């Protein structure tokens, strides 16, 4: 916390994460949440929004499946998490790292790489690709969507603009993905950062 010339600035080397404390926030009268998305990718905003939406819905329904979406918060690119000053200076949850008053141990953490989006279906099981990062045949990719947790696919085929088989697809080219998985336009494609 920096105080100078009549203003106060709060700077943190950590990302605020309050998903485990939504009940306390709602009980305190909070009826709107702001996801910090400035300078973040559409993938980041989609995953974070989905996790918080599922957690808020679970407050009403008691559905415990929201916890699997919570895990995605640890898979996206993020700094060490903290609950900020909501509960004082110390850590409330050991999965959130040190308290806000301790310097962060690591830079950005990321278990998954955002690869792009599924585009228009051009024929049954064949979709245009809107890629941001490379994918290759033989690797395992995942599809996620607002109500779809994860669909793994390691048997997809990649096609060039002439529908000829290729080994890899890259950003900025007209390419297609052929799969037997039940996916749709708009699904997000991602892969683990350490390719197995």
Spell out what each predicted region is:
Residues 1-196:
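Surface-exposed amphipathic alpha-helical tracts and adjacent flexible/coil segments at the periphery
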């Amino acid at each position: 916390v920096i105080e100078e010339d009549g203003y106060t600035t709060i700077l943190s080397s950590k990302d605020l994460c309050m998903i485990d404390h939504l009940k306390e926030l709602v009980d305190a009268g909070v009826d709107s949440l702001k996801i910090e998305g400035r300078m973040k990718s559409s993938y980041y905003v989609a995953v974070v929004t989905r996790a918080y939406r599922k957690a808020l819905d679970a407050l009403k329904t008691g559905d415990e499946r929201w916890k699997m979406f919570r895990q995605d918060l640890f898979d996206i690119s993020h700094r060490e998490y903290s609950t900020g000053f909501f509960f004082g200076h110390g850590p409330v949850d050991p999965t959130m790292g040190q308290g806000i008053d301790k310097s962060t141990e690591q830079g950005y953490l990321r278990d998954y790489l955002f690869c792009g989006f599924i585009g228009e279906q051009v024929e049954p099981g064949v979709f245009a690709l809107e890629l941001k990062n490379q994918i290759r045949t033989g690797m395992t990719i995942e599809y996620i969507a607002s109500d779809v947790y994860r669909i793994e696919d390691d048997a997809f085929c990649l096609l060039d603009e002439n529908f000829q088989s290729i080994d890899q697809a890259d950003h900025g080219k007209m390419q297609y993905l052929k799969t037997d998985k039940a996916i749709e336009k708009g699904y997000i494609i991602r892969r683990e950062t350490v390719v197995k």
